[in-house]
Amino acid sequence: MKKVLYIAFNYNHDTGIASKRIRGVSKYLPSFGWNPVVIVPRTSNETVEIDNVKVVETDYQDMISKFMPKSNNTGRKREVSGRDQTNRFVSKSLSLAGEIFAYPDSMKYWKKPAFEASCEIIENEQIDAIMSTSSPVTSHLIAHELKEKYDIPWIADLRDLWNLNPYINHNFIRKFFEKRLEMKTFKNVDVLVTTTEIAKQTLKEIHPQKRIEPVVSGFDEEDFKNMKQTRKNEKLTLMYAGSLYSGKRDPSILFDSINQLICENKIDKDKITVDFYGDETNLAELSRKYDIEDNVKIHGRITQKEVLTHQMNSDVLLLISWMDESEKMFIPGKVYDCMGCKKPVLSIGYREGSLKDLIEKTDIGYHVSDVDECKKAIYDYYTKYNNENLKYCGNEFADEYSMKNTAKRFAQILEEIL
């Protein structure tokens, strides 16, 4: 059995979608002839134990608390006081400090202990290949230095692009240094991996000579093996889990659509509810604007396991994306949970792109980009719910999006670069 050293900062995280791809690949690589040795930071998270996966914890100094103020966002309006103004100044100052000192990311102090632990493993075990996954990009810096020292084949998995990530807004000075660092880091990489074909073409613009392979994610069937809906909802229940990225993912189309359908007497205001699990970016204020505050329930962040439980007990799962052309390259990991839960999907986002193509290919629901389309989708789901025939309609293509197939593709690439 061959061995791959896997630099994966988020392996143990249980509140983010990133860990699902990492753990899924680690779990199923042994089925295709590769045993992973996963390098992770020692944090408060418990180590996830998976058969045939060796996890090595390293020392880790957290930097983020030095630069990021604790959030006190309750979703309620507050009067602006002198103290608020001071806090805003402090927040901006900390943000600027982060631009300077948290370069290339706030996990930079993990690089040294992770590199040293990796060297020890390589020198004492037969490591055939290296994989690194971002974010954080520090993972790739570690792999780059290992590649330089040992000349072992290396795959860099970019779950999100580095400099071409529209969700990260650096100043022009930081952008200059980031791009230079990306070019230097990937100079000796064997294969760059993205999550979609569009992301591959985008990355090709700055790495035209590199081999780039799109490897989509998927759902792990075992996560859903013993899960089932435990209650019947008295209202059509829509659910969204995750971040709204400070308004980039805007639920206005959803709220406006529900409001219009209620005003048109097409749906009963007392027969629909929307649950949000995650951050609270303007949700309360926005729901009041559209007069549906009684229909919108705002909850805090929960673990991935809790997310799946709530998804199983919801009727329709929401995906809300940024209404920007750059969003075309993304497929949010949550869509694979929708397939695993076998729940209908309502996706709201840019009019075209990877996500829309996937939803249409698999027939798992609707992808809409304006209020009229959204109203039609909600009304269709509402009517089917009232007639007790609302169900998941994913076709045979949906079953192809499994973590086992994702790991299989990584194993194929690993074999090709030996």
Spell out what each predicted region is:
Residues 1-64, 191, 197, 212, ...:
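N-terminal subdomain of nucleotide-sugar transferases
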Residues 24-25, 101, 138-141, 145-149, ...:
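Membrane-proximal helix-turn-helix segments that form the acceptor-binding/catalytic region
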Residues 41-112:
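A conserved catalytic-core segment of Leloir-type glycosyltransferases
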Residues 63-72, 219-234, 385:
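Acidic anion/phosphate-binding donor-loop and adjacent secondary structure
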Residues 198, 218:
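Carbohydrate-associated surface elements
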Residues 231-248, 255, 406:
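Conserved donor-binding/catalytic core segment of Leloir-type glycosyltransferases
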Residues 249-252, 303-309, 317-336, 346-357, ...:
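Nucleotide-sugar-dependent
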Residues 269-273, 283-308:
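Nucleotide-activated donor-binding/catalytic signature segment of Leloir-type glycosyltransferases, i.e.
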